[in-house]
Amino acid sequence: MAANENRLVWLDMEMTGLDPEKERIIEVAVVVTEPDLTVVAEGPVLVVHQSDSVLEAMDNWNKSTHGKSGLIDKVRASTLTEAQAEQQLIDFLSQYVPAGKSPLCGNTISQDRRFMFAYMPNLERFFHYRNLDVSTLKELARRWAPAVYKSFEKKSRHEALADIYESIDELKHYREHFLKL
C-alpha cells in the first residue's frame, strides 16, 4: 500500500509514571487511519524491557494498574529496547505515511510526545509538529455540552492498543454529536 500524507497516525504509550526525567516507556502501539477514521493498519504492540529497579520505583497506582493488566510481567520478559521499538515503529509507519506529515493523534498526547522526545527522538521527528488531541474536544464538550461529554463512556484499560481504539471511537463520538460539519 502506498504511503499517503493525509493519513493519521494514532499512538499510545504506557509508562512507569508521568515524569520523563525519571520514568520510562514500557509499552507502545500505533494505528494508522484514513482522514475519515477508518483503520488502514494496526501496528505492532511493543513491550519494552525495563530493569527491575525501574519497575520497582513505580508508584502504587502504576504498580497496581500495570500489574493487573499483566504488563509488568511482559516488560520483565521482553528483550526489546526502546531504540529497537522505535525503529520497528518507524519502519512500520513508513509503509503508510511519509515522515513529517501526520500529526500525532491520540488522547493527552503531549505526554506521549514528551516521552518520545526523551527516549524515541527519531519517532518523535517522524510526526508533524502538530497534534490531534482528542482530549481537547473532551474538555470543550465537558464545558460546553456536558450531555455529549457524559454520553461517551471510557473504559480506560491502560493498554496501549485498546486505548488507541478508544480514542478513535471517542473522536467519532464527538464528530457525530459535538462538531457541526
Curated annotation (Swiss-Prot):
Localisation: Cytoplasm
GO cellular component annotations of the record: cytoplasm
Assigned EC number: 3.1.15.-
InterPro entries reported for this sequence: Exonuclease_RNaseT/DNA_pol3 (IPR013520), Oligoribonuclease (IPR022894), RNaseH-like_sf (IPR012337), RNaseH_sf (IPR036397)
Origin: domain of life: Bacteria
Pfam families: RNase_T (PF00929)
Keywords, ordered alphabetically: Cytoplasm, Exonuclease, Hydrolase, Nuclease
MF (Gene Ontology): 3'-5'-RNA exonuclease activity; nucleic acid binding
Main localization category: cytoplasm
Main EC class the enzyme belongs to: hydrolase
GO process annotations (BP): DNA metabolic process
Annotated Exonuclease domain residues: 8-171
Catalytic residues (positions): 129
NCBIfam families per the UniProt record, alphabetical: PRK05359.1
Known role: 3'-to-5' exoribonuclease specific for small oligoribonucleotides.
Family from the record: Belongs to the oligoribonuclease family.
Protein name per Swiss-Prot or TrEMBL: Oligoribonuclease
Gene: orn
